[in-house]
């Protein structure tokens, strides 16, 4: 049996150390939302039928494990929807939940680009979309090949 390797268009293999996608996560409501932005256009990510993930937001004083589970599930939703790794996020969280979110993201190995409170986001767009656009702006860029 012969195996073959799929290469990138320029012929070089993909960089396994390159940063993954950056998403916006809103945990300020009763159920978390996840979104991604490309070129400044954001879209809310949803689960496929039969693969739903429970994203109920725990109380601010809940155990750290509950917050970590929420962050991991939000990341899972994003990775399934995008079919690529997610490594960075901007999270919308009430002030009381900010510390929990920060610790949970660290445990889940998700790099927090910023935590914003709901009152820091103005405008008619849903907060998760604004967070996704901010995540795209703050995410590390992949260097162009030389």
Tell me what each language-model feature is.
Residues 19-21, 28-114:
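Conserved phosphate-binding loops in N-terminal lobes of ATP-dependent enzymes
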Residues 2-46, 125-146:
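Gly/Thr-rich phosphate-binding beta-strand-loop-beta motif of the actin/hexokinase/Hsp70
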Residues 1, 6, 60-64:
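Detector for methionine-enriched segments
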Residues 106-128:
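Conserved phosphate-binding/catalytic loops in two-lobed NTP-binding clefts
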